[in-house]
Amino acid sequence: MWFPILTWLVATAVALDCSAKDLDSYNFALLQGTHAVESVKDTPPSTTKTTWYFGICESVSSKKAPACPKNVDICGVTEVKVDKDYIVTQVVGFNSNLEKKYTPVESKNENGIKISYKGANWGSSLVNAEVYYICAEDKDGDDTFTVESWDDEMLFAQVKSKAACVTSKDDKKKPKKPEDNGESWGWFTWIFIFMVLFLSIYIIGGAWFQYNKGNAIDFQSALREVLENFVDLVRGLPSFIREIIEKVTGSNRGEYSAV
């Protein structure tokens, strides 16, 4: 039970982190969210549409990209339309827990940073990706995402944005809280999980104790007895709580009258 929970925590904790030390000189919070690049090609007798999604500061949103797997930084979806409807024929995902390599881009014409992904599982193949984030001082909110090439092995993409320019800490925009895609667990869910675990341990442990003491013919009878006692306890809770409230309120009224 705990292994899936730990796996989920690891997968969600290592998405493209805008507060990573390697990105400290940039302002990637300006790009936070899911961005899409779409291309349509006429492939008679069909039409092929390819959409690449990029999740910045958070994984790709399942609401904006329902065909993509969960917890991916980059996702490519290929759809083919023969008559009226598009059919998904190919999905490529670069999982958020892949190790990322950050390489500064410094040349006479361009500055920024390159983020590399290596060894993403795609069927029986391993695929790689390199995304170049290039500084564009003149772009204020009008960022450009471009897919340079994809050959079923290597993805090259480029993002021109003000976010890729070296920025002082005072000028940085703080990352907003990631969009809840229904993939995150709130405090209520954790309380529910621990309650279920506690009740399971209480019921099974109590039945085992009764059985070992010899108070029950078999384990099933012991389990039934513990369940009946638990149901009686739950039924008696409202009366118990009401009695406590009446005593407390009655005590307060008595003190007030004495004064």
Swiss-Prot record:
Residues 206-259 are cytoplasmic. The chain crosses the membrane at residues 185-205. Residues 16-184 are lumenal. Its main location: membrane. Belongs to the ATG27 family. InterPro entries: Autophagy-rel_prot_27 (IPR018939), Man6P_isomerase_rcpt-bd_dom_sf (IPR009011), MRH_dom (IPR044865). This is Autophagy-related protein 27. The keyword Magnesium does not apply. The keyword Lyase does not apply. Disulfide bonds join 18-57, 68-75, 135-165. Residues 1-15 form the signal peptide.
